[in-house]
Amino acid sequence: MMEKKVHELLERLAEVEEVLGNPHVYDDQKKYRALTQEHAYLNNLKKSWDEKKDLEKQLEDNQELLKIEKDLEFAEVLKDDIRQLQSRVQELQLLIENLLVPPDPLDNRPSIIELRAGTGGDEAALFVGDCVRMYKLFADRKGWRYELLSCTPSEMGGFKEYVMVLSGENVYRFMQYEAGTHRVQRVPATEAQGRVHTSAITIAVLPEPDENEEIDLDEKDLRIDTYRSSGAGGQHVNTTDSAVRITHVPSGIVVYCQEERSQHKNKDKAMRLLKAKMAEIEQQKKQQELASTRAQQVGSGDRSERIRTYNFPQNRITDHRINLTKYNLDYVINGDLEEITSALVAYFHQEKLKTSREE
């Protein structure tokens, strides 16, 4: 099964190389970039496959030699070579299996992270603030860029809602699995009895549509309202109607932005968020059509799903999807998310791999 799939992809490599050899390929830069990325992926697969076949031939030859070798010293050399060859063949087998799950074209897309306070009132709003800080620090570690789209501060601190954009290498690859319900257990500062309270926030992660991606938004379906922005905690408050709220009437989706002093800039940011939400709806429709097996449904990013618990009294963080529990919440909340996000990427990659093997 694997060999058949590899040969199909190697045939595709020959087709891509033929297209890239045509001088007119540069006329469409978007298509050219996509082809060069596909070529790099397929060429990497070919190199690994060729090396595996060569080593398997060497392994077979050495095993045949060992059967007839009389010299004990040389026989030990052959055995050592066989062990090394077997180890490398296994490595290449795993590498090829992983390569048979093609890279997701969304991996490098800028990601819109939307955090909302849920059950727990002020404590949930404070936790939104904690998570915003956590993701900013994680972005710093990864070398990603950060941009605020909109936020609604809470009177007691934190945020009722916070929307930001992270951009950089593999942003969506790592951040997509943050979508869902995050539960926090801790003793609020106002709790005199020292009782642990449970609160929750929801997080949505939307890959920002590509500039060339067609998002069907009819102007007559949009209601655009302007109003005066409001702030808290000493933030600048406009005296002009610079804040913008856009309603997509057919779907009922509402987005807004008031962070910029310019109405034009606020409208641009609100439109970016609206387009991302509309693209997500289209993507979910496609996923539902394809999701005929559980493996395809895993990791759908359903924001109603409780995915993680942060227990501050025990310094414990648990990701329920992969049964991962760590007692280093103090590090994680300060941006050390690498271990958790990498474990999630590896887990869901294996789920995709299972699906690939079954096809």
UniProtKB/Swiss-Prot annotation:
Its main location: cytoplasm. It is found in: Cytoplasm. Methylated by PrmC. Methylation increases the termination efficiency of RF1. Keywords: Cytoplasm, Methylation, Protein biosynthesis. GO terms for cellular component: cytoplasm. GO terms for molecular function: translation release factor activity, codon specific. Residues 289-299 have a biased composition (Polar residues). InterPro entries: PCRF, Pep_chain_release_fac_I, Pep_chain_release_fac_I_sf, Prokaryotic/Mito_RF, RF-1. Residues 287-311 are annotated as: Disordered. The modification N5-methylglutamine is found at Q235. The keyword Protein biosynthesis applies. The keyword Protein biosynthesis applies. Transmembrane segments: none annotated. Disulfide bonds: none annotated. HAMAP family: Rel_fac_1. Peptide chain release factor 1 directs the termination of translation in response to the peptide chain termination codons UAG and UAA. Belongs to the prokaryotic/mitochondrial release factor family. This is Peptide chain release factor 1. It comes from Protochlamydia amoebophila (strain UWE25).
